[in-house]
Amino acid sequence: KTAALVAQIESAHGLAAVDEIAAATPRLAALMFGAADMAADLGADTAWEPLLYSRSALVAACARSQLLAIDAPFFDLRDGGGLKAEVARSVALGFAAKCAVHPTQIGPNNSALTPTSQAIAEARAILAENAKGVGAVNGRMVDEAIARKARRVLAVADALFSRTDDADGAPP
C-alpha cells in the first residue's frame, strides 16, 4: 500500500497550475490552501475576504479532480469566536477539512465539519424524495443537484462514524 499525498497550494503560480498539480499523481488525496504564503505572494492580508478567490479556485479544482479540499489554519490562537466563524465559512465554501495549528482548534474544527443528526436526517429525506423524482423536503425543492449534496453529507458521516469507537460520537 502506498501513502496518500497532500499538495499545498500557497502561491499565485501554484494556483495558476492547480489543475495540473491536482492531476500530477493518483496518490494525491487532497489539496491544502496555504493562506499565509498566498497572502504574502499576493501582497494581501490573511483575512477571509482578500483570499476568497484563491480559496474558491482551490475548492473548484478539488471538485473537478475529486480531491479533498483542506483549508488553511486560523492564525489567531486567542480568538475562539473568529475560529468558529471562519471554519463555518470554510464548510460553506466546500472545504472538507481545516488545518489546526493548536490543540484548542481541533474541537471547533471537528464540530463544524461533522454532520449533525439533523443534517443526516435531512440528507436521508432528500434522497428518499429524490428517488421519486423532483419534489420537496421541508418546503425546499429537491432535484439531482440537491441530492448530490445530500450524498456528500452522508458519505462524510459514514466515513467519520464508521471509524469511531466512541459510543456517543455518532449521531443516529
Where are these regions (language model features)?
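Expand to "…catalyze enediolate/carbanion chemistry for C-C bond making/breaking, isomerization
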Residues: K1-P172
